[in-house]
Amino acid sequence: MPFEFPRADKPEDVGLSSPRLARIRDALQTDIDKGAIPGAVTLVARRGQIASLDALGYRDREAGAAMKSDTMFRIASMTKPFTSVAAMMLAEEGRLLIADPVSRYIPEFANLEVAVDSDDRSVNKPKTEPSRREMSVHDLLRHTSGLTYAHLAGPFLKSDYEDARVVDEKQTNAEMVGKLGRLPLTYQPGTTYAWSKW
């Protein structure tokens, strides 16, 4: 049985305003009515209690399926702050060292290769060299790991990323990590900042 968070009888019981919370709901409903978004779920909690929980619009507009409060979403880059906070909490507990090599936790990231820029356009695959040091957890948190998006990888690596189907919604995280571990990094770990979802 899933854990149920306690609910406040009314928002004012935890120091929030019902009319102000209604403004959030109204603004989202306006976007739903305009077709800007299909639906949304909002939850506002304070002092350990849920003050407001709303499911608005549709989880599947075409099928007419209403949004539910437990509908699951892909939240894209919003996972980054959650992941960073979780990593810092694990570090505080001594269960994760930020300076550790990623391969300590994900063996597929050991012995990575790094693409080397080349002016020789006659080759189909990028030249590679071994990474000078292992990718660290810190590198992942600050986007200096050498991993990147296919469209940012440059002409040589772009096709490698696309051919490997790194982004495939049907694969498991383990399958994706295996693919990433076989691809060359775009730069040496710790040397260059590049926004990445990995």
Model-derived regions: residue spans:
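Beta-lactamase-like hydrolase cores
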Residues: G15-R46
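Basic/polar N-terminal segments that are highly enriched at the extreme N-terminus
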Residues: M1-P19
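Short beta->alpha transition motifs characteristic of CBS
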Residues: I50-D60
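Structural recognition of the beta-strand scaffold that forms the well-ordered cores
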Residues: V41-L43, S52, D139-R142
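Residue-level signal for well-ordered, solvent-exposed loop/turn and beta-edge residues enriched
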Residues: Q49-I50, R95
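Active-site-proximal loop and beta-strand segments within enzyme catalytic domains
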Residues: F3-R7, A22, Q29, Y58-W195
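Short glycine-rich loop/turn motifs that provide flexible caps or phosphate-binding loops at active sites
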Residues: V14, K34, P38, L56, ...
